Amino acid sequence: MRYTMYKEYDKKGVVYMTTKNELNKKISTIMKTDVYTVSEEATLKEVLEVLVKYKTSGLPIVNKDNKVVGFISDGDIMKFIAKQNPRIIDMTSFITVWYDTDSFEQKLHDLMGLNVMELATTKLVYVESDYDIDEAAKVLGEKKIKKCPVLENGKLVGVISRSEILRYALSSYLEKEAAKAE
């Protein structure tokens, strides 16, 4: 969707031009540019420390050249903790399947020493900085993800999240409604 201009009148009859859809603005206007990243060499303990310290749900993973090579989210970590690994025992043709009974604490302990790339999403989903907000919303919605890196000429310049898009959309809507009420 691209910009569609149309005339709108305010209460005093003054004509002004506006966009038909406020989500046509570029994501660069609302994305977060103070991006926290982790190295592809990081352990999950280091990742969790960054997630907690900066109260974020996901982080781009960069290599030594600062190129984005993956993304790790709290969802990836929760999947690891929640999974139950089957343990198959074959006793002379009697096959038994038991599921591990590792406690949450044990799984968390096992998690801490893993390299981030063992759990990370390496099929990188990203948007370009010149995407319209509605295009970014479509990517996040179709891929069912909460946030993704924003790249410009292959370099990380920000992150965009569903919550930022929704905050912007609601704010724009409320401002427009308030202007109509004046």
Task: Tell where the protein language model's regions lie, with residue ranges.
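Tandem CBS (Cystathionine beta-synthase) repeat/Bateman regulatory domains
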Residues: 1-182
